[in-house]
Amino acid sequence: MSRLLWRKVAGATVGPGPVPAPGRWVSSSVPASDPSDGQRRRQQQQQQQQQQQQQPQQPQVLSSEGGQLRHNPLDIQMLSRGLHEQIFGQGGEMPGEAAVRRSVEHLQKHGLWGQPAVPLPDVELRLPPLYGDNLDQHFRLLAQKQSLPYLEAANLLLQAQLPPKPPAWAWAEGWTRYGPEGEAVPVAIPEERALVFDVEVCLAEGTCPTLAVAISPSAWYSWCSQRLVEERYSWTSQLSPADLIPLEVPTGASSPTQRDWQEQLVVGHNVSFDRAHIREQYLIQGSRMRFLDTMSMHMAISGLSSFQRSLWIAAKQGKHKVQPPTKQGQKSQRKARRGPAISSWDWLDISSVNSLAEVHRLYVGGPPLEKEPRELFVKGTMKDIRENFQDLMQYCAQDVWATHEVFQQQLPLFLERCPHPVTLAGMLEMGVSYLPVNQNWERYLAEAQGTYEELQREMKKSLMDLANDACQLLSGERYKEDPWLWDLEWDLQEFKQKKAKKVKKEPATASKLPIEGAGAPGDPMDQEDLGPCSEEEEFQQDVMARACLQKLKGTTELLPKRPQHLPGHPGWYRKLCPRLDDPAWTPGPSLLSLQMRVTPKLMALTWDGFPLHYSERHGWGYLVPGRRDNLAKLPTGTTLESAGVVCPYRAIESLYRKHCLEQGKQQLMPQEAGLAEEFLLTDNSAIWQTVEELDYLEVEAEAKMENLRAAVPGQPLALTARGGPKDTQPSYHHGNGPYNDVDIPGCWFFKLPHKDGNSCNVGSPFAKDFLPKMEDGTLQAGPGGASGPRALEINKMISFWRNAHKRISSQMVVWLPRSALPRAVIRHPDYDEEGLYGAILPQVVTAGTITRRAVEPTWLTASNARPDRVGSELKAMVQAPPGYTLVGADVDSQELWIAAVLGDAHFAGMHGCTAFGWMTLQGRKSRGTDLHSKTATTVGISREHAKIFNYGRIYGAGQPFAERLLMQFNHRLTQQEAAEKAQQMYAATKGLRWYRLSDEGEWLVRELNLPVDRTEGGWISLQDLRKVQRETARKSQWKKWEVVAERAWKGGTESEMFNKLESIATSDIPRTPVLGCCISRALEPSAVQEEFMTSRVNWVVQSSAVDYLHLMLVAMKWLFEEFAIDGRFCISIHDEVRYLVREEDRYRAALALQITNLLTRCMFAYKLGLNDLPQSVAFFSAVDIDRCLRKEVTMDCKTPSNPTGMERRYGIPQGEALDIYQIIELTKGSLEKRSQPGP
């Protein structure tokens, strides 16, 4: 192959040759990732450690070796001398005096300089020998060694001339190999180093694989399941390894030892789905097979952001005309400052969505792939597949061929755009996620579903009781004074009967004459006890009873042919009750559910004390009393009582007054809501996706407004949400409204706030976005018994399981027979012969977003256990088998530190030299000097909410996002108040934008004699820039001038960090600073111009975090292999990693994790030109050693479906959380096996 797959590393051998012998290095010159940063530091003088007089004297704190603790000139405690010399070598550049002075002034300005610091004990640790001449070469050599066998296998596929497809496919169970002429030969497994592979599953029959096709450089292969070839009445739904596809070990053969596994590569499109159906992947000890996903490589090369994906689909369907906006639209966009109009569409031609058909069209071209046969696997039965076997095998083979063609084009591109070998090695390791489970998984599913159904029944009964109680308001028309039920259908259906036929009177016969002494029913004579009846009296009574029954039977002819449905009941109630002829008939309003519009009314829901109301046009909102302008609209002489159904506004006023009295104040004060689930900063936090969605909604809404203005020039827009004169707004309440087109006498209508903005309607107040509002009391069930509040509480409790149970219950669990379990499990005292031991392979897309973050719908988004959420103990059901433990840790403030170190390297080349960096390293929550506390104090919000805004800014969100979020967190804020708070926050953190004029701009200022104020560096403010642009445009007949040469943020705690992020995002080819990965071609400036800045700034931090993870995975694999630690990678959830480790190796694995974190952080510092690392971020605050997967080892995970907790119900005790000092004590600071204490 003409292209070298890996670029050569200076001073290191590359390829299959021997890896250089490990050894220490002495760092001399350290390459900087940014030439300007490196130049600035090389120009700084090398000065002595003692700095200017402003620096306070440090206490003489001794290290464990008896020396002084190491500090940098800004009083940040650094690595111990021993660790520093092992990693960075001796010596190194010291920051210049000017840089230190500039940093001190900056920290003084933000009130951080001179804050006391708590010293940490030094960590003295002998690291394993490192390879190469520096950290970068160390990681390069490790990654090359780990990925080289797979890269060689990939090379075989790249250079191969594939054999032709066989003319017919063998109808035979198991694997079949096809020769050059198409001859079919049964084989146990495909003995190949590299395969392109595709599995198809008949979904109607469950998750068992149905058929598969593979191709190697030399032959085609097909596989058929026993369930396809052999017809049976039924098959078991429980999967075992025998149902899966063998790729490494023939059926019936024993598993090889760890050393005997061969390195093999499988390539596929969304290959994690195919991996889930491979037998050997479920073994506890794992194999050496690795997987390359063409879908993930596409995302890294030419993937789309979520907003771009929407635009791409719209353009593909012809719903969006690809043309630049009008001048009027551009002007309005600039004026609104909500984000640019989409003016560059070049990216449409170099990107696509993720489907194989579209990816093939992008990279290969040619006729489109035929995808219609796929529907048979989705909707058809096994019989349909048997009848169309040859066609479906050809379809599967076509996908394999297309995947190979895509792979041939992608891999060279991927290696060019992600040149560091750590990226590929990390993705290969990410592709073998593994979650061990046992019989407790089945118990969890049953308990959660049972609890859910029980609560559902209780909620149904509560709702039915509410409906029955509401029906009683018909008496005396009391419903007319009910703030919720007044506008329901209260019309009654009268009881109808046919007219009686006229019959000719017959003369009374003896038998029809009244019997003497027999009274009518109910006659007092009947009640009198006359003693025992005579035989004659008994006979007479029997005759009379038969006559009455005969008469009653005759009235059936008067009933209508179609029986009436609940006559005498109001219309809304009748709709909730099934008809008598319904096969599923049950008594009462059993059709009632939370999805019905009548339910919030029956529950008497209030929003801040105002009753909820539904509008066909605006969705759910609430009624605010006090409006008087529409009371006069009634016809003259008509009273409210005679006007028909009229809103009981006086009752609503009384309701709100009562609410205010209960609150103990006349008017409600602002109160912060809890966090919606997608904004909780837990391991499933989706904030990095929400930022882009919310930020671009502003762009979309503004574009729609411009289209409306352009459609009718000079014509005012139609009535908006706040249409109407100002005096029709309440003075004591503000919110999303009033919407005066909802004309309800005596009341204003306000919409419930929607997370996507005021223009969106709320379809249900029971949506999960309103759960925090239920918890903080904003959304409440009204008075009148406990049924309403209880139903609301139950809705909150079952929300998680209702939304997730299908995904959870459909997880593919494979139970292992005893013969497939390792000896460490079988011989452990806790092994249960009757128990079940198996695994789930989470179908992780290793690079599922443009930031190359992994994506998976269940496990990577699972929330932590909550006491009021059924089934939320999900993650704790991942439980290590006997003899094994789960070892892992969370990277502390990963993205904050990455952003901070980028800013520090850019500003003065010292850790903690910016306010943002200092707060990340030295800030203390107890003193209010950490980042989140500072933001909370500045804006006057809670610390939890401040976290969201801080992460949002780092992910590229602008001020509109902050305004939206402020109003979502505190819906009682006005738009103006939210804008002021957001402006205050961004001015204090991000700073203000300043501009440096271009040569053309300077010439215009001189020629036009325009007065502008400049800072010391020649920067001008936004106001002066607008003045220059306005005057030059006016005096040159609106000619466009390029007056800006450079933009920069100034004056905020995070200004330098944002300047660095934006400089990377706007560079010609943005690359991550550490591993040098390119941004997607669909977001390169040459394709998008100035568009999609949110996504691009977000990419810098998030993609660097992925670099961090890949470095960790490579380092952990090295240490596990080097020191024979028996363990395997399990899963990475955002900034958390977990490994499955033999019990006896757990402490060595914990030490390996700590060393991995140290080397990874040092790699970041080294690549940014910083020859040191602060002690506070060098090690994990704690490494968790546990038997199950949970956020904290002390969490008992009590939930409604697990009320007694993990220890009592499942027998899982609390785990261990060990810091670096405890781990060193347990392991004696060594990774060698002899250092490991007993279990």
Curated annotation (Swiss-Prot):
Q: Which UniProt keywords apply?
A: Disease variant, DNA replication, DNA-binding, DNA-directed DNA polymerase, Epilepsy, Hydrolase, Leigh syndrome, Lyase, Magnesium, Mitochondrion, Mitochondrion nucleoid, Neurodegeneration, Neuropathy, Nucleotidyltransferase, Primary mitochondrial disease, Progressive external ophthalmoplegia, Transferase
List the residue(s) that the UniProt entry marks as the site Critical for replication fidelity and mismatch recognition: 853, 1102
**Phenotype when changing residue 312 to R:** In PEOB1; sporadic case
Q: Where is this motif: Pol B?
A: 943-958
What happens when you mutate residue 648 to R? In PEOB1; sporadic case; also in SANDO
Give the region (Trigger loop) as residue ranges: 858-864
- Write down the EC number: 2.7.7.7, 3.1.11.-, 4.2.99.-
Q: Where is this motif: Pol C?
A: 1134-1141
Consequence of mutating residue 552 to N?
A: Decreases processive DNA synthesis
The protein's matches in PROSITE patterns, at most eight in alphabetical order, are given as: DNA_POLYMERASE_A
Q: What residues bind Mg(2+) 1, as annotated? A: 890, 1135
Spans annotated as Does not contribute to polymerase and exonuclease enzymatic activities: 43-55
> Impact of mutating residue 501 to C?
Decreases processive DNA synthesis
* Quaternary structure annotation from Swiss-Prot or TrEMBL: Heterotrimer composed of a catalytic subunit and a homodimer of accessory subunits (POLG:POLG2). Interacts with TTC3. Interacts with LIG3.
Q: From the Swiss-Prot or TrEMBL record, give the protein name.
A: DNA polymerase subunit gamma-1
